[in-house]
Amino acid sequence: MADYLTKAPQDELDVNIKELVNVLNSFDAIQTIGSCGGHPNPLPSQWEEGTWYVKFDVEQSLEGWHTIEFLAWAINHEYDEDLTVFFMPKSSPPWLNAPSQTLAWVIEGYNKQDPNQLADFLYKVKSDFYKSAKSLETKGD
């Protein structure tokens, strides 16, 4: 991952978002870069109570792409039947930045979705189904 990315100290994270940040950072190709667990009286940079997000960068590699595919399947296909959790790309205007520097990924929750439930789900499906891209490549040989 890029040198400028460092994991946020646990004491700086909103309590209800820590487990989701931790499970995302447990993937080798992911580095979280922002989060908010929602607040009863939010400041301008915070989200309202009952909503939350985690934003992250993904390594530009086969492993990174494989991890994105896994999360897209797990979150968008297997997890949220009510469509209140969204996994999607986000970007600043690319013409204002260097190439390959604006794309990030975000998971957003609405309608009082519990980020800890998503974290538990991701821990389970990662344990049960996730294989590294490298291990899958060697299977076909």
Task: State the predicted function of each range.
Residues 1-141:
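Structured alpha/beta or helical-core interaction and ligand-binding surfaces enriched in interleaved
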